[in-house]
Amino acid sequence: KKITLLTALFGTFISASFAQNKFGYINSRELLEVMPEVKKADSSLQIYAKSFQDQLESMSKEYESKVKDFQANEKTMNEAVKEVKVKEVQQLQERMETLQQSAQEKTSKKREEMYKPILEKADKAIKDVAKENKYDYIFDASGGAILFAKDSDNVLSLVKTKLGIK
């Protein structure tokens, strides 16, 4: 009996404490999609990544040319020349692989650098909206953590207003 009574009292206490809290949610992906800073960052990142892509395409053409040249003239080459040509092709292939890996790492790092202030700005706006509107909790619906929420508690429009986005 004591356990049942304690469970009932505990359940009532939990229900009462949740009833006093104000919950809200936002889809952070949707917020980021409408922030002009994200569009600028994405555009800059595309240009940055394109410079690496152009280098890789140039190296790829050079690689194809060397392979075709080797295949066309292989029968007339002595062993020493063959070794040199094979080594050139292998070294070019290694440089291409290194450049591709480096490009991915540098682009990823650049993206993190460019997005950091944007994410901080969005986070600050969400926290400001939560405090100004007396929310106890704001959940991110883009993470799939909420299955149901009233539209009236979606704070996306308030955060967009806070950021000056229409």
Predicted regions and their residues:
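Bacterial Sec-dependent N-terminal signal peptides
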Residues: K1-F23
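Amphipathic, charged alpha-helical segments and their helix-to-coil junctions
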Residues: Q20-K166
